[in-house]
Regions:
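Structured-RNA-binding interfaces characteristic of tRNA pseudouridine synthases
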Residues: 1-165
Length: 165
């Protein structure tokens, strides 16, 4: 519901936001406390089963195994013969409190890849949680946020005052 435009640029007429991106980053926020923070619950999933640092360490280990180029057909909702080989550049897992005076524990998983298949971010999160907690958990889409998209500099059109080489 809340979208903020931080910047904009004039681009080529041939620019396609979905095809010209070089990387996309998704953020998945999980409240691991039994009771969710009422101020952040609209944008945070609640999975109170993740409680120990050893489980978070197991999630980190599973995340490390996904970094690189892999065929993600099994971790997507793709039914058509679309290219399923994608490269994950980085997966970071952090476990903290939402604020210093807060008793709510927050697990944040950030996934950066060259591209994502349909439902791939959710299935990656479910895979990581299964490896860490050894329990099947369905991803609540409330915790998934598109954090950023990176485009090459060549997509921008030079401004009227600049010289084109």
């Amino acid at each position: 519901k809340d979208i903020h435009i931080l910047s904009s640029e004039i681009v080529s007429d041939r620019f396609r936001s979905d095809l010209n991106a070089v990387s996309r980053t998704y953020l998945y926020r999980i409240c691991t406390a039994p009771v969710q923070n009422i101020f952040t619950r609209a944008y945070t999933a609640n999975i109170p089963e993740i409680i120990s640092e050893s489980e978070v360490a197991a999630i980190r280990k599973a995340a490390d195994s996904l970094v690189g180029v892999h065929d993600f057909r099994s971790l997507s909702g793709v039914k058509k013969k679309k290219g399923t080989v994608k490269e994950i550049f980085d997966i970071s897992v952090s476990h903290s409190k939402e604020t210093e005076n807060d008793s709510f524990s927050l697990l944040t998983i950030k996934i950066c890849a060259n591209d994502f298949l349909y439902l791939m971010p959710e299935h990656i999160i479910e895979f990581l949680i299964k490896k860490g907690v050894d329990k099947e958990v369905r991803c609540n889409p409330a915790g998934l946020l598109l954090h950023s998209i990176t485009y090459p500099d060549s997509c921008s059109v030079p401004s009227a005052g600049s010289k084109q080489v």
